[in-house]
């Protein structure tokens, strides 16, 4: 093996390790809230990780198109078939280009990923804490600023603090309305979450 090839191999392994570490960290990004200069203002959250470390970044950061939303439920989404592997730069295809509306779901968990600044939420079909869940995420993009602030204010009325340093499991599930685009994420530790399918981007509103 030539020295040049060996060096390239080392660089590749180093980059792969860094990207893997960032991907793992992004699943528990709230731990990095102390890095945010204005943690309480969800519209001033500054993404720390590079776009390249964010799985399917360009596919996720899009506006929700102004088309008729299809009515669906968490229960139905949990039955959708999942692809074994999707490339990290894959564009949206098929179902991912459609908008869906969940009229009745329950918000179980809400937090801000302080690395990419997305608001990540776990929702279920029933209020039961053991019910299987799916993810809904509101991106950092400026067009979602009002939606993020609205959710933050609504949760505050229920005594729950949501910002870059606070969030997590809600003491009691709250009924919500969700509208967003279907998105298939990659496999990672998801706890109660039972599918790779998400609504991302999504706007979540408490009833």
Q: How does the language model describe each region?
A:
Residues 1-8:
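N-terminal secretory signal peptides that target proteins for export/translocation
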Residues 9-19:
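Sec-dependent N-terminal signal peptides
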Residues 29-207:
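OB-fold and OB-like single-stranded nucleic-acid-recognition modules
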């Amino acid at each position: 093996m030539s020295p040049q090839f060996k060096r390239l191999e080392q660089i590749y392994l180093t980059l792969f390790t860094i990207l893997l570490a960032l991907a793992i960290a992004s699943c528990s990004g709230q731990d990095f809230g102390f890095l945010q200069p204005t943690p309480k203002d969800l519209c001033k959250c500054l993404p720390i990780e590079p776009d390249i470390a964010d799985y399917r970044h360009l596919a996720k950061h899009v506006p929700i198109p102004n088309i008729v939303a299809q009515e669906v439920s968490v229960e139905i989404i949990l039955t959708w078939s999942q692809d074994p592997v999707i490339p990290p730069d894959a564009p949206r295809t098929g179902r991912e280009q459609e908008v869906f509306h969940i009229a009745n779901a329950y918000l179980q968990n809400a937090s801000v990923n302080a690395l990419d600044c997305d608001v990540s939420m776990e929702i279920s079909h029933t209020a039961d804490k053991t019910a299987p869940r799916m993810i809904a995420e509101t991106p950092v993009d400026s067009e979602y600023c009002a939606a993020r602030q609205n959710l933050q204010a609504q949760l505050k009325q229920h005594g729950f603090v949501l910002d870059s340093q606070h969030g997590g499991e809600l003491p009691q599930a709250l009924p919500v309305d969700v509208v967003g685009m279907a998105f298939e994420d990659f496999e990672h530790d998801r706890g109660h979450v039972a599918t790779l399918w998400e609504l991302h981007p999504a706007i979540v509103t408490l009833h």
